[in-house]
Amino acid sequence: VGADAVLLIAACLTPDECHTLTIQAHELGLEVLLEVHSTSELSYIYKETDMVGVNNRNLGSFVTDIENSFRIAEELKKAIAEIDFQTPPLLVSESGISHPETIRELRSAGFRGFLMGETFMRTDDPGSTLEELIHGI
């Protein structure tokens, strides 16, 4: 039993720290989910980055705005296209996701992973909620 991945939050690190920690994580057999909140943090993406998550929750105010993923999506795809990846990173939209139509729209914008927590914490039956989401996609 152990971890498969680590979360590196760009807002808490310098680009060099992020790169060093990514290399160290890989040496330990871990994948890295790099979390960004704005286009100014796209410079934290390196060719070794496995996944890039766009957090839709403002870390200062804790307000969630799903539009953050859509605002960043095009610049994120451009930044990734400029890097010589062996395998391009998986794009993940994080927080504020609760409806199948939102997931469909995020998929159209290039996201393939979806981090959801609050939706399941607020329901009495997380299993049914997940089933409804899956069938709605």
Predicted features along the sequence, with ranges:
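Metal-dependent enolase-superfamily TIM-barrel catalytic cores that perform enediolate-based chemistry
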Residues: 4-34, 44
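Short loop-to-alpha-helix "cap/lid" segments that border enzyme active sites
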Residues: 13-20, 39-47, 51, 59-87, ...
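Catalytic cores of alpha/beta
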Residues: 1, 34-48, 93-116, 128, ...
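Alpha-helix boundary/capping residues
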Residues: 25, 49, 76, 110, ...
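Short, well-ordered coil/turn segments that N-cap beta-strands
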Residues: 3-4, 28-30, 48-50, 87-89, ...
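Glycine-rich phosphate-binding active-site loops on the catalytic face of alpha/beta enzymes
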Residues: 1-17, 54-63, 96, 110-130
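C-terminal helical cap(s) of enzyme catalytic domains, especially alpha/beta-barrels
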Residues: 72-75, 107, 122-137
